[in-house]
Amino acid sequence: MSSTASQQPTQGSASEPVQSLTPAELVELARAAREHAHAPYSRFRVGAALETRAGRIFTGCNVENSSYGLSMCAERVALFKAISEGEREFTRMAVIADTPERMPVRPCGACRQVISDLMGPDAEVIMANLRGELEAHSVVELLPAPFDRSYF
């Protein structure tokens, strides 16, 4: 699967529920997206796979820039790709990187804020490493006090 394409793993009419992927399947799509990462500076390659309520999958990888602040994390790439294609309702995201044992990768603070704003508090984030270790948390568990619409 290309990190630039979306995948629709299941088909269904508006009246029949869409069967979502297992956590392991979503992580595997994130792992495949990781292969496309552009990380010449940190060599820290990250992949993400985002599932919409309709069952569509959007993947992303991190893309680094020599001006580090212009780099983009895999989680935001996947979310922005989905938003740009008209999706607005998300259920889960998987993110994977090569992290030490017993430490699945965790989204950075900027990604947690964007995830919170675009996915909502009850969506699930599945964090994984290449050793097969998984950890899942709700968005509100990752960012319990977000800067959100209530400030406006």
Residue ranges and their predicted role:
Residues 1-28:
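Short, compositionally biased leader-like segments
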Residues 16, 39, 67-69:
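Short, surface-exposed loop/turn motifs that are enriched in glycine and acidic residues
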Residues 24-39:
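Short, basic/aromatic recognition patches
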Residues 30, 48-49, 78, 82:
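Small-residue (primarily alanine) positions within well-ordered alpha-helices
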Residues 42-43, 72:
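Short glycine/proline-enriched turns and hinge-like loops at secondary-structure junctions
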Residues 43-52, 126:
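Short beta-strand scaffold segments in enzyme catalytic cores
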Residues 59-152:
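Zn2+-dependent cytidine deaminase-like catalytic core
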